[in-house]
């Protein structure tokens, strides 16, 4: 599909200030899509009566590159390049919200990393379809943070799916999908960056297809589906029965995503801030041995070398 077909398509974009939103939005702008608005969750404000939607008109500014390891510019900086309005929302079901968004007259609603459920009265504003970019191979890892669960489950590959928005989260028909390998020890922020780039490419293709009525949705498979919520404390625990390679891969993955794995010897809890490698062998004595260069954590088949801090009594 020629991405040039995306040029001129009226796109209302939903996201938040993160790489998985900024990179696809950058791609839509570069492809020539007509960005008619950017919707983000409103920041918390004091007071009991929050306005359901607030419109801000950004001033036109210079084109900004995406930062390397940072999450890129805030979405309002990208919107300002093409003088697109920003909408901060607290209630997507409010009449005022629907009326304000209806004025943008979108052909396509494009969503990537937006944390709020989008109701049908908003989805229906798009005359050519409403789609979401999800960083997993749906139907596996539905939910708010699939990248964490890729590492928790030890997946050797994942991917990105663009699907139609429906009442059920992450369950709409698939319109585009691509696989991404997950190599041993791949840092989570690198995987996130890969997903953002693939998602951006797929989204531009999907908008181009929607512009000429060429979307070909297919139902998600009925097998292999999973849904995981936000990780809880126990999900961050490294089990002493794990192999050292599994623990190393898990920690390397989730630390750059903002999570801190932990380990317990049954009496004390140790928070892991960095992992430096693995070594074969088993030592006798404490499960955690400290040294001048960090700590050695005994696992099922070897030792995980890490930097740790003691977190108090066993959880």
Language model region names:
Residues 276-290:
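A conserved acidic, glycine/proline-rich C-terminal tail/linker
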Residues 1-257, 262, 289-306, 310-314:
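One-carbon transfer enzymes
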